[in-house]
Each structure stands twice: as structure tokens, then as C-alpha cells.
């Protein structure tokens, strides 16, 4: 599995800001969008382009355009919604597929409860977004679902990943690409990433 920890100074700075314990909901939400945008820039760097001729201000001009990529953004509810706008800043025409999965606080196992996928999912590359890759359970369950529906191409974008989650994801779905702003130390006994960001969903939505 291709794993890319994006070490651009802007990303490192913004993730550092997100680790502040008393960060406001507004600021955390803004930073999640910004880092999601920067990760999208990196994750799409291998998209092929083609030359096309358009009518410019002074006549025909040859320009580069993305070649034949149908994209669907797949936020994992609910926290993934906090990164979605950052992706759409760069790919505003992308279709949105929504997958609802929560993690049982006792077993730490993923529990699917909702999905609404874009049409022709089998023809699209899926950019799956979720702030935290902790145990990997929710991400694995989401990719299982997408594959069942015929999707063949995936890129996973997360703010912070734990080594345990990366290992689990690679074992279950070695064909995906993972882009993360940080690979942290470990999971604690409650399944939270350390040092991590805390509960990203609560911080994005202002809930406890």
C-alpha cells in the first residue's frame, strides 16, 4: 500500500495548531478544511492531463485539462464532512457519496448505518475522507462497501493516522493509497490516537 505522509511546512504548521487542547470549534473546522485542501493537492498530483484548445481572449489557445477523471468525494459521517469542502475547492464538479459508520465505544468495532453513493460509482475514483485513521475499522468498512458497489480506484485522505490503523488498512486493502498530514505514535487503550487531535467529530461539530 502506498503511504504518503505529506510533510509540507504549511501542513505541519496547521496540524500543530489543531493539536491545541482549547482550540475553538470555528478554528478547528477551518483548519480541517484547509488541511483537507492541501492533502487533495498532493493526492491528485498523478492525475493525467491532456491538451485541449479553447477560445482565449485573443483567439484559440492550447491549455492543459484533467484527462477523463470522474471523481467522487466520500466523507465518512460525521467527521469526514469537516474535510469535504477542502476537497471540493479543487474538484468542484466531484460527486459526493456519503457513508455513515460509527465506532462502538465498547468494542471499537465499526457499525454501518447509512450510505448514499454517487451514480456510476464503478467509473469513478473515490477520495475517501475522514480526519482520523485510528484502528482503521471505519475506513476498512467503508472501502468494503465501495468495492461491493463496484468502485475500483481509491485514495484515502486523513489528517492523522496511527501505525495500528495503517497496518490494518494495508492488510485489508493493500490496493489503496493513503495520504495523511501526520503519522502519530500509537493508540491508547480507548482507541484514540496519541498525541492525536482528540475527538475530531466533536471538535468540528461543537458537541461533547
From Swiss-Prot:
The keyword Transferase applies. Pathway: Pyrimidine metabolism; UMP biosynthesis via salvage pathway; UMP from uracil: step 1/1. Disulfide bonds: none annotated. Its EC number is 2.4.2.9. Binds 1 Mg(2+) ion per subunit. The magnesium is bound as Mg-PRPP. It catalyses: UMP + diphosphate = 5-phospho-alpha-D-ribose 1-diphosphate + uracil. It is an enzyme of class 2 (transferase). It comes from the Bacteria. GO terms for molecular function: GTP binding; magnesium ion binding; uracil phosphoribosyltransferase activity. 5-phospho-alpha-D-ribose 1-diphosphate binds at residues 78, 103, 130-138, 199. Keywords: Allosteric enzyme, Glycosyltransferase, GTP-binding, Magnesium, Nucleotide-binding, Transferase. The keyword GTP-binding applies. CDD domains: PRTases_typeI. Allosterically activated by GTP. The lineage of its organism: Bacteria, Pseudomonadati, Pseudomonadota, Gammaproteobacteria, Vibrionales. This is Uracil phosphoribosyltransferase. Uracil binds at residues 193, 198-200. One of its GO terms (biological process) is UMP salvage. SUPFAM superfamilies: PRTase-like. Belongs to the UPRTase family. NCBIfam families: PRK00129.1 (NF001097), upp (TIGR01091). InterPro entries: PRibTrfase_dom, PRTase-like, Upp_B, UPRTase/APRTase, Ura_phspho_trans. Pfam families: UPRTase. Its cofactor is Mg(2+).
Amino acid at each position: 500500500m502506498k503511504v504518503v505522509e505529506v510533510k509540507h511546512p504549511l501542513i505541519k504548521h496547521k496540524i500543530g495548531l489543531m493539536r491545541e487542547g482549547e482550540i475553538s470549534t470555528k478554528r478547528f473546522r477551518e483548519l480541517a478544511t484547509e488541511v483537507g485542501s492541501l492533502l487533495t493537492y498532493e493526492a491528485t498530483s498523478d492525475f493525467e492531463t491532456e491538451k485541449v484548445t479553447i477560445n482565449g481572449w485573443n483567439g484559440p489557445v492550447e491549455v492543459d485539462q484533467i484527462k477523463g477523471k470522474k471523481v467522487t468525494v466520500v466523507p465518512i459521517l460525521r467527521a469526514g464532512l469537516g474535510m469535504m469542502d477542502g476537497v471540493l475547492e479543487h474538484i468542484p464538479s466531484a460527486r459526493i457519496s456519503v457513508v455513515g459508520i460509527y465506532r462502538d465505544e465498547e468494542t471499537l468495532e465499526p457499525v454501518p448505518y447509512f450510505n448514499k453513493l454517487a451514480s456510476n460509482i464503478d467509473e469513478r475514483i473515490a477520495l475517501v475522507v475522514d480526519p482520523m485513521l485510528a484502528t482503521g475499522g471505519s475506513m476498512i468498512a467503508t472501502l468494503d462497501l465501495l468495492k461491493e458497489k463496484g468502485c475500483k480506484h481509491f485514495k484515502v485522505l486523513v489528517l492523522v493516522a496511527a501505525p495500528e490503523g495503517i497496518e490494518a488498512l494495508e492488510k485489508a486493502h493493500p490496493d489503496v493509497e493513503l495520504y495523511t498530514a501526520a503519522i502519530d505514535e500509537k493508540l491508547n487503550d480507548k482507541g484514540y490516537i496519541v498525541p492525536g487531535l482528540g475527538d475530531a467529530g466533536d471538535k468540528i461539530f461543537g458537541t461533547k
